[in-house]
Amino acid sequence: MRSYLVNDTPQKYEVVLRQQEELFNALIKAKQIDEASEESKDEYCILCVHDPVYTIGKRTVEDNFLLNMQSLPAPIYKTNRGGEVTFHGHDQWVGYPIFDLEQHGIGLKHHIERLEEAIIFVLSHYGINSHRSDKGAGIWVGNSKICAIGVRASRYVTMHGFALNVNTDLSYYNAIV
Protein backbone atom coordinates (compact mmCIF):
# COMPACT_ATOMS: atom_id res chain seq x y z
CA MET A 1 0.00 0.00 0.00
CA ARG A 2 1.23 3.51 -0.78
CA SER A 3 0.24 6.45 1.42
CA TYR A 4 0.73 10.15 0.75
CA LEU A 5 1.34 12.40 3.73
CA VAL A 6 0.81 16.02 2.64
CA ASN A 7 1.25 19.14 4.75
CA ASP A 8 1.32 22.66 3.30
CA THR A 9 1.99 24.29 6.68
CA PRO A 10 5.75 24.93 7.11
CA GLN A 11 7.37 22.05 9.00
CA LYS A 12 10.57 21.95 11.01
CA TYR A 13 13.12 19.90 9.07
CA GLU A 14 14.13 17.78 12.06
CA VAL A 15 10.51 16.68 12.66
CA VAL A 16 10.04 15.53 9.06
CA LEU A 17 13.50 13.91 9.02
CA ARG A 18 12.58 11.90 12.12
CA GLN A 19 9.29 10.85 10.46
CA GLN A 20 11.19 9.81 7.32
CA GLU A 21 13.70 7.80 9.34
CA GLU A 22 10.94 5.98 11.23
CA LEU A 23 9.11 5.02 8.02
CA PHE A 24 12.39 4.13 6.26
CA ASN A 25 13.54 1.89 9.14
CA ALA A 26 10.10 0.26 9.43
CA LEU A 27 10.10 -0.63 5.73
CA ILE A 28 13.61 -2.10 5.94
CA LYS A 29 12.60 -4.08 9.04
CA ALA A 30 9.47 -5.39 7.29
CA LYS A 31 11.64 -6.57 4.40
CA GLN A 32 14.09 -8.33 6.74
CA ILE A 33 11.35 -10.08 8.71
CA ASP A 34 9.54 -11.41 5.67
CA GLU A 35 12.05 -11.56 2.82
CA ALA A 36 10.39 -14.65 1.35
CA SER A 37 7.04 -12.91 0.96
CA GLU A 38 6.09 -11.33 -2.34
CA GLU A 39 3.50 -9.25 -0.49
CA SER A 40 3.83 -5.52 -0.96
CA LYS A 41 5.18 -3.57 2.01
CA ASP A 42 3.82 -0.16 2.99
CA GLU A 43 5.41 2.73 1.10
CA TYR A 44 5.02 6.45 1.72
CA CYS A 45 5.57 9.77 0.05
CA ILE A 46 5.81 12.78 2.34
CA LEU A 47 5.06 16.11 0.61
CA CYS A 48 5.65 19.22 2.66
CA VAL A 49 6.99 22.73 2.97
CA HIS A 50 9.80 23.49 5.43
CA ASP A 51 10.75 26.38 7.62
CA PRO A 52 13.99 27.83 6.15
CA VAL A 53 16.90 25.40 6.53
CA TYR A 54 20.07 24.32 4.71
CA THR A 55 20.75 20.60 4.41
CA ILE A 56 24.09 19.14 3.54
CA GLY A 57 24.59 15.83 1.78
CA LYS A 58 27.54 13.46 1.70
CA ARG A 59 29.37 15.40 -1.03
CA THR A 60 29.20 18.79 0.71
CA VAL A 61 32.48 20.55 1.40
CA GLU A 62 32.96 23.84 3.23
CA ASP A 63 33.70 25.51 -0.12
CA ASN A 64 30.00 25.00 -1.00
CA PHE A 65 29.22 27.92 1.34
CA LEU A 66 29.90 31.47 0.21
CA LEU A 67 29.36 32.77 3.76
CA ASN A 68 30.79 31.63 7.07
CA MET A 69 28.61 28.69 8.14
CA GLN A 70 27.86 30.40 11.48
CA SER A 71 26.44 33.49 9.72
CA LEU A 72 23.98 31.71 7.42
CA PRO A 73 20.41 33.07 7.44
CA ALA A 74 18.95 29.64 8.35
CA PRO A 75 20.04 26.61 10.41
CA ILE A 76 22.09 23.75 8.89
CA TYR A 77 21.35 20.02 9.14
CA LYS A 78 23.78 17.31 8.10
CA THR A 79 22.00 14.47 6.30
CA ASN A 80 22.89 11.03 4.98
CA ARG A 81 21.54 11.73 1.50
CA GLY A 82 23.57 12.05 -1.65
CA GLY A 83 24.42 15.40 -3.11
CA GLU A 84 25.77 18.64 -1.77
CA VAL A 85 24.20 21.56 0.09
CA THR A 86 20.68 22.78 -0.67
CA PHE A 87 18.11 25.11 0.80
CA HIS A 88 14.56 24.26 1.85
CA GLY A 89 12.02 26.93 2.70
CA HIS A 90 8.57 28.41 2.32
CA ASP A 91 6.91 28.09 -1.09
CA GLN A 92 9.14 25.16 -2.01
CA TRP A 93 7.53 21.72 -2.20
CA VAL A 94 9.71 18.94 -0.87
CA GLY A 95 8.96 15.28 -1.59
CA TYR A 96 10.32 12.34 0.35
CA PRO A 97 9.44 9.02 -1.33
CA ILE A 98 10.04 6.08 1.00
CA PHE A 99 9.80 3.29 -1.54
CA ASP A 100 11.06 -0.28 -1.84
CA LEU A 101 12.71 -0.21 -5.26
CA GLU A 102 12.81 -4.03 -5.35
CA GLN A 103 8.99 -4.06 -5.37
CA HIS A 104 9.17 -1.96 -8.54
CA GLY A 105 12.01 -3.87 -10.18
CA ILE A 106 14.27 -0.81 -10.46
CA GLY A 107 17.56 0.45 -9.08
CA LEU A 108 18.51 3.80 -7.58
CA LYS A 109 19.55 5.40 -10.88
CA HIS A 110 16.18 4.53 -12.46
CA HIS A 111 14.38 5.83 -9.35
CA ILE A 112 16.13 9.20 -9.68
CA GLU A 113 15.31 9.29 -13.40
CA ARG A 114 11.63 8.62 -12.56
CA LEU A 115 11.64 11.47 -10.03
CA GLU A 116 13.09 13.75 -12.71
CA GLU A 117 10.50 12.61 -15.26
CA ALA A 118 7.67 13.24 -12.78
CA ILE A 119 8.90 16.78 -12.05
CA ILE A 120 9.29 17.54 -15.77
CA PHE A 121 5.73 16.26 -16.34
CA VAL A 122 4.28 18.41 -13.53
CA LEU A 123 6.12 21.52 -14.73
CA SER A 124 4.95 20.96 -18.32
CA HIS A 125 1.37 20.88 -17.00
CA TYR A 126 1.96 24.49 -15.88
CA GLY A 127 3.52 25.47 -19.21
CA ILE A 128 7.09 25.40 -17.88
CA ASN A 129 9.65 23.91 -20.26
CA SER A 130 12.21 22.08 -18.11
CA HIS A 131 14.96 19.54 -18.69
CA ARG A 132 17.67 17.38 -17.17
CA SER A 133 21.27 18.51 -17.29
CA ASP A 134 24.61 16.77 -17.46
CA LYS A 135 25.53 18.93 -14.43
CA GLY A 136 23.97 16.26 -12.20
CA ALA A 137 20.64 15.16 -10.77
CA GLY A 138 17.90 17.74 -10.76
CA ILE A 139 15.69 19.70 -13.12
CA TRP A 140 16.54 22.93 -14.90
CA VAL A 141 14.67 25.76 -16.61
CA GLY A 142 17.17 27.31 -18.97
CA ASN A 143 20.38 27.67 -16.95
CA SER A 144 18.60 27.80 -13.58
CA LYS A 145 17.94 24.79 -11.36
CA ILE A 146 14.29 24.61 -10.33
CA CYS A 147 14.41 21.23 -8.58
CA ALA A 148 17.17 19.61 -6.54
CA ILE A 149 17.30 15.85 -6.03
CA GLY A 150 19.21 13.99 -3.32
CA VAL A 151 18.38 10.43 -2.30
CA ARG A 152 19.61 7.78 0.11
CA ALA A 153 18.98 4.06 -0.34
CA SER A 154 19.66 1.01 1.80
CA ARG A 155 18.47 -2.51 0.95
CA TYR A 156 16.71 -0.87 -2.03
CA VAL A 157 14.61 1.32 0.30
CA THR A 158 14.77 5.06 -0.40
CA MET A 159 14.46 8.22 1.64
CA HIS A 160 15.06 11.93 1.01
CA GLY A 161 14.01 13.01 -2.48
CA PHE A 162 13.37 16.30 -4.27
CA ALA A 163 12.94 20.02 -3.55
CA LEU A 164 10.89 21.92 -6.15
CA ASN A 165 11.11 25.71 -6.07
CA VAL A 166 7.63 27.13 -6.66
CA ASN A 167 7.75 30.68 -5.32
CA THR A 168 10.82 30.31 -3.12
CA ASP A 169 12.78 33.25 -1.71
CA LEU A 170 15.90 32.72 -3.83
CA SER A 171 18.02 35.07 -1.71
CA TYR A 172 18.82 32.10 0.56
CA TYR A 173 20.76 30.57 -2.34
CA ASN A 174 23.16 33.53 -2.30
CA ALA A 175 24.93 31.86 0.63
CA ILE A 176 25.67 28.58 -1.18
CA VAL A 177 27.23 27.41 -4.44
Question: Where do the protein language model's features map onto the residues?
Answer:
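Catalytic cores of processing enzymes, dominated by hydrolases/peptidases
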Residues: S144-V177
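N-terminal lobe of the biotin/lipoate ligase/transferase fold
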Residues: M1-W140, K145-I146, S171, A175
